[in-house]
Each structure stands twice: as structure tokens, then as C-alpha cells.
């Protein structure tokens, strides 16, 4: 996760996405997973991968709807004028 954060801050979005994907695949229940999903979507948007970014932010909202990161994802999508479908309740607990 932290290697993804370092790559993201350096503007190395492809590397950041790779590290965030690893967190999501290997540790989907980790407390860092919602942040990894959010950052992955942001990195995709920042690297002009609009559709992938939108998809990942929607996945964030669906997988972790009660997380603070989902609130940020909703805000980002709303700001982009992207419609958000209602999410099902999740098992995410703060």
C-alpha cells in the first residue's frame, strides 16, 4: 500500500495502480483496501483513464459504501457529473 502512495505522490500513476491492485487482490478485507480503491481510481483519472477511474470509484462505493473513502468517491463522481447507482449495505465497519 505504502509503495503505491509513494508512487502516486511522485506522479508515477501506472506503478501506483499496480501496488493498489495488489492490495485489493491480496487483502480485500484490509482496513487499507477502501483507501487503495479510492487512490487507484484517482490515479486512473489523473492519468487520463477516465472510464477506468469511474469504474473503480463505483467499485469503491459498492464494496465499501459506509467508508469515508466511499464518501470521497461519491463526491468526486458527483463533481464529474457521473451518475451513481445506489449501493447495497456492506460489511465494512470503521
Tell where the protein language model's regions lie, with residue ranges.
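Acidic, polar-rich low-complexity tracts and alpha-helical solenoid repeat scaffolds
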Residues: 1-94
Amino acid at each position: 500500500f505504502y509503495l503505491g502512495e509513494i508512487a502516486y505522490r511522485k506522479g508515477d500513476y501506472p506503478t501506483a495502480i499496480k501496488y493498489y491492485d495488489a492490495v485489493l487482490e491480496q487483502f480485500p478485507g484490509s482496513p487499507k483496501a477502501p483507501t487503495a480503491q479510492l487512490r487507484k481510481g484517482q490515479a486512473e483519472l489523473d492519468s487520463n483513464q477516465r472510464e477506468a477511474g469511474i469504474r473503480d470509484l463505483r467499485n469503491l462505493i459498492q464494496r465499501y459504501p459506509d467508508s469515508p473513502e466511499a464518501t470521497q468517491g461519491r463526491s468526486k463522481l458527483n463533481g464529474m457529473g457521473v451518475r451513481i447507482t445506489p449501493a447495497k449495505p456492506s460489511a465494512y465497519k470503521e
